[in-house]
Amino acid sequence: MTVQEIKNNLKKFDRKQLYKDKVAKMQHSMEHLGVDGIICFKPQNTFFLSGFNPVLYSHPVVVIVPREGDAVLLVHSLRARHSADEAAIDDIRLFGMWANQKPIANDAYTAIGIIADDLKLKGKVIGYEGDFISLSQYQKIQGITNAPKMVDVSDFLKRSRNIKDEYEINLLRLSSYLTNIGMDVALQNIRKSEAEASISAEIAMRETWAKELSEFEISSFGNNEGGIVTALWCYSNSGYRVPYGCECPGDRIPLEGEVCLPVCWAAIDGYHSENERTVMIGKIPDNYEKAYDAMLAGRANVFKMMKAGVTASEVYDAGVAPYIEAGFKDFLPGRIGHGVGLSLHEFPSLAKDNNLVLEEGMCVTVEPGLVFAGWGSTRHSDTVVVRKDGIEILTSSCEDRLIR
């Protein structure tokens, strides 16, 4: 599918209605969850429900969803125009003084209390994000709403985000396209230095975005002390630095007989993709080359068997089987992939003991890898979509067995 075809597909969707549908689906689940309302602060969750990303979260963005009725988006007055232009939630309330805006309160928590009163959530059971908010926030919410009971809905939100609709998958196709561009350029510069490979990939991704995709945002989600305006990233590590897992690139030039691992990440309208490739620099030691070929075999196994209906543990077993056969049982990874979407690392983990049944629309990485401390690693990572009868592989590189 070409970039233009993907863009044409996206035009068929009513973006704001898709976000409204997510809210409606959440409301439909509230009786089962045993809650009367849900209050979200986590940037990925508030975006998932509202379609609004202020980029900088120094002032909280809050979505309050009652079991019945319309959801409310609460933002600082500074974000009034931005949220009005982009959010799918119609009822936007403001807090904090800024220019000539008319906030309902000076601070977010007083505003939440007013909204809870309007939505008749005072004295009701409230769902909260136990994996995100602090104890102080929990206590404030409970006090403001007079909730007799608070229910952690974190797992529900994680699972809701994991299954993507076709609109989200098209965005993932575009972010994957950018990582593919970046990876090809990183491979062309891999022998120069970690820094050269990394920056050349980032430049290529940014130039491609500017020429072909600049109508889409490439930001990610910040926190209360900063924001991520541009989420087109690459880092390449070499030799003994590869097992660090994630490290800033430096001036190190890879040596003959080592491996390099360039990692390209990209986001389009909030949806992230990951593309990683292990590159052999010349001839590597036989034992490590054996591990490299086992990695390719494990990856091929997963591509062949992965589909809706299989379990995460079955995927794991297929991915590591060639490692065991090749004598690397003592080096097996804890997982061979993870969910991607509004975060680079999200639910679920493709781990040995995870009996989660994969469903159509789930988006995960496939990355069966080995780590050899002090030497390097063998790992490719691809972003894939689980389909009824197989998978759709979104990421790629010019070849699989990479020698430079």
Language model features with spans:
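Active-site neighborhoods and metal-handling regions in enzymes and metal-associated proteins
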Residues: 1-404
